[in-house]
Amino acid sequence: MKISEEEVRHVAKLSKLSFSESETTAFATTLSKIVDMVELLNEVDTEGVAITTTMADKKNVMRQDVAEEGTDRALLFKNVPEKENHFIKVPAILYDGGDA
């Protein structure tokens, strides 16, 4: 399956990435090869092969859900540079807006 350069540009725009023309061409070629290799898996005869979802023998290894004493809030906030309404205030890393 051929991945076009236009598809690469479209996904790059949605991902807020920018590539040069040579990078776009290289990505289109590489992604096309990857998709072709994955499509080869459809040709494998799996008749009679049991469904396998994991190779690990362990299933849902979890600890007991036990309530524990938390850290004293005053002690926790002692070294916090900025707080607001009993919450630790941190710099914003996500902004509202954009094309995605």
From Swiss-Prot:
It catalyses: L-glutamyl-tRNA(Gln) + L-glutamine + ATP + H2O = L-glutaminyl-tRNA(Gln) + L-glutamate + ADP + phosphate + H(+); L-aspartyl-tRNA(Asn) + L-glutamine + ATP + H2O = L-asparaginyl-tRNA(Asn) + L-glutamate + ADP + phosphate + 2 H(+). Signal peptide: none annotated. It is an enzyme of class 6 (ligase). GO terms for molecular function: asparaginyl-tRNA synthase (glutamine-hydrolyzing) activity; ATP binding; glutaminyl-tRNA synthase (glutamine-hydrolyzing) activity. InterPro entries: Asp/Glu-ADT_sf_sub_c (IPR036113), GatC (IPR003837). GO terms for biological process: glutaminyl-tRNAGln biosynthesis via transamidation; regulation of translational fidelity; translation. Its EC number is 6.3.5.-. Heterotrimer of A, B and C subunits. Belongs to the GatC family. Allows the formation of correctly charged Asn-tRNA(Asn) or Gln-tRNA(Gln) through the transamidation of misacylated Asp-tRNA(Asn) or Glu-tRNA(Gln) in organisms which lack either or both of asparaginyl-tRNA or glutaminyl-tRNA synthetases. The reaction takes place in the presence of glutamine and ATP through an activated phospho-Asp-tRNA(Asn) or phospho-Glu-tRNA(Gln). This is Aspartyl/glutamyl-tRNA(Asn/Gln) amidotransferase subunit C. It comes from Streptococcus pyogenes serotype M18 (strain MGAS8232). The gene is gatC.
